[in-house]
Amino acid sequence: MTTREGSLEAPTRHPLDWRNPEFYDHAALEAEQERVFEICHGCRRCVSLCGAFPTLFDLIDEGKSGEIDGVAKADYGRVVDQCYLCDLCYMTKCPYVPPHPWNVDFPHLMLRAKAVKFQDDGASFRDRLLTGTDRLGRLATIPVIVNMVNKANATPAVRGVMEKALGVAAAARLPRYAEHPLRANVERSVAWPVRDGGRTPGKVAVFATCYVNYNEPAIGHDLLKLLAHNEIPYRFAEQEACCGMPKLELGDLATVEQLKNVNIPPLAALARDGYAILTPVPSCTLMFKQELPLLFPDDEDVKAVADAMFDPFEYFVLRDKDGLLRRDFSQPLGKVSYHIPCHARGQNVGQKTREALQWVPGTEVNTVERCAGHDGTWGVKAEFFAESMRIGKPVFNRMAEDDPDYVSSDCPIAGRRILQGIEDKSGPSRARKEHPLTLLRIAYGIE
């Protein structure tokens, strides 16, 4: 039977067999890399997505044979280093994903290579620091320390030293740390009656995320205000650690499991008690919806959490379809340039944020669906910063079109990178960077 390009069946994804000793076998890994790279070489649809594919194709084209057998196995790592696990090749481009018999899952092959590298070599101090978001946040928000950290991160001379000593790009804008983390300053929910809809549970558990908790708690407070405005009772889990996505991108799967063991039991209890679980950062949502179930396919608690997990705007749009969301918007937003992050696209729920913003009268939404180049910790590393800005340049240009009133992305770090890209080119922008949850709060006229 002839193997055809593409498939008439819906894409599926196999669990990651990361506990199998063969997963870490160098020869087995290199054989699978060679097989997949050969398929990618014959296709090349993903060349515009990230640096991994141009790096691979340059290695092949500049090799002695012009084929994958002309590429030294030692150079495979150069491809792996350029992959930041955005998942767009798998989700939007590749015609050979399962159930196609060629069974190509490029991101998870790169994850396997990162896991092997981590097992062999560990990680640098810089990478351990950047991916320890929860620990870093707890330390940086200590009252005596937080102002010193923020001042240091905004001082060019200090940033120059940080680049030389740690490898954190001096030119990359870093987020401020909050004096009052979200989880320590939560508005208590009113005990509204629970109104379940056909598509949505009527009560919400919020997973704060490291970034919103320690860096931009206002985003979390705005989410709570939106829930309160719509009389949806909410609460937080009793305990919370990092979702594990930064450690996943590092290949540190053992720490991913440790974090899972902290987060999943309380979240699973909430899921089984009928709560929808909302996370205001797409990478965290994707971690619970997709990556943890693929890493721990036999864990029923992980499955329960995945089934209860919603992107906030996915929840609000479905709540609206249930006839249980208010549309009493009083403030137009004007021109909004809205960016759809990679990890929001990877959830396959459609453009729910754009749909919700378009509910607001007097609002024009310019939607940009392309990688902004920040990609977790990857885009602040000195060796990748210039490449990350190059990847984001088309997004920066399109987001600046029509002189917007707001620049917005579901991913807060992508939003910051976009505004930096705009201002690096054209100087200070009149556009305000605001999260879509903040925009909806403004549109409701909520203070």
Predicted regions located by residue number:
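Generic start-of-chain signal for non-secretory N-termini
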Residues: 1-38, 447
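A structural signal for alpha-helical segments
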Residues: 28-31, 71-74, 101, 251, ...
